[in-house]
Amino acid sequence: MKIIELIMMEDEKRAGEDTISLVYDPAIEENFVALSKQQEGRVALSSEYMRMTLSDADKRIVTGAALVPNKPIYRNDGGDEYYIYFSKDTTRKASESFLKNGYQRSTNLEHEEGDRLKGVSVVESWIIEDEVNDKSRFYKMNLPVGTWMVSMKIDNDEVWKEYIKEGKVRGFSIEGWFVDKMKTKTKTEQARLK
């Protein structure tokens, strides 16, 4: 089965990621954690494997990987099976482009095009620089250097109660414009990744 490295397009206005979708089954196979405030003021961590215990003072923040570098991601386009991956460099460029272009509020559910969620916003973004001394370790995540992490604030009551708390969505999935690195040498073919 072929393996394709995707890179950023040269057209900066269309290049890279432009949406983060909340999904049940993220292609990067990494789920987020939902943060809630306990009565004593301590932070509790919850994931898809644990039933969340939330007080009235929910933080309503989910934190997880948006993109993991060099992780093979299975694709099947009309019977054409292959894997894609993003290098550390492309992952960093995608994260920078996302913020630079102001896409922090560009979120949807399960890649529903044109259906942008209100009251959902990326409030934190970082690249893991050190596997041991990174904030992701605090959240019990074991991810490689170069991973793009995000925290999303969920002020939308419906999304928080019906999707996050009920476990209907468990992770992030990116959408954006990328190209096959090998094909850029001969002909630029762009692909909208979802």
Region locations from a protein language model:
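Signature of dsDNA virion morphogenesis modules
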Residues: 1-194
